[in-house]
Amino acid sequence: MGVKKHLAILSYLSDKYGDILQKFSNKTTESESDIDPASPIWICWWQGEDNMPELVKVCYETIKKHAGSHPVKFIAESNYRKYAAFPDYIIEKVQKKIITVTHFSNMLRANLLYEYGGIWMDATILTLKDISFDNMPFFTLKAPAKKNNGVSMARFAGISGIAAPFRHDKNSPAVSRWSGFLLAGTKGSCIFEYMREILYAYWKDHKDQIDYVLYDYTIALGYDNIPEMKKLIDNVPCSIMEKFVLEINMDVEYSQENISKYLSVPFHKLTWKKSFNKFAKDGKLTIYGHLLENRDL
């Protein structure tokens, strides 16, 4: 059933937006420069910084700490128009809640990265190493997939004894080839131009999403039909990224031994939507509790 749905969505989008695919099929990336070390890091929290949950604030602080030469640009509902313009039909559907904030943010990241370049990072990324994607025109987090009992498994390079189900199985459009929550590239890049155009076109024609991961489906469609887009994605090296492992161990008691295996990993994708315990059963801080009290791992 998953395979049929996956293929049906791609087939529908391909038929509906074949003109866009054709338009971009001859795009080249030869003129694209490498990611500018002074380009912005884009962070969005729609409700504003003051309304971030505490764990998100910790993640945001670590991003700023490791931003290096990249200026950090904070985007919220109150200021996004300063940086990005959208067609009236998009704004109207956002105001009517036809387009959710989550799906609007997908268009926002494509818009910002196309207009300015830089790095889009979800506000829930705990960052432990300096951010630098020099010497490449495009970057995203990707992992080698190891199939295990039908589930795609991502294993850390250099870290033994850790394995966790990768959140995209083999029928997902991303299949570990990219991560929408961390994308980086150059101003005017064809990949972001395409993403913006097809998402605008989709929401002009529709009042609901064909699937929650519509964003990944549009990237998959481009990957399959636009050679230069495929090249950009394929040229990104596999990252050290058991990116969800820390999240599922937040209630583990904090100790240097228990966190040592996470420290070599630059990015950990966390969530504010789950309830974690600040203290273990013996009263000692959990990893979650340590993060809140020390603002870092």
Q: Language-model features: where?
A:
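Active-site acidic Asp-centered loop
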Residues: 116, 121-123
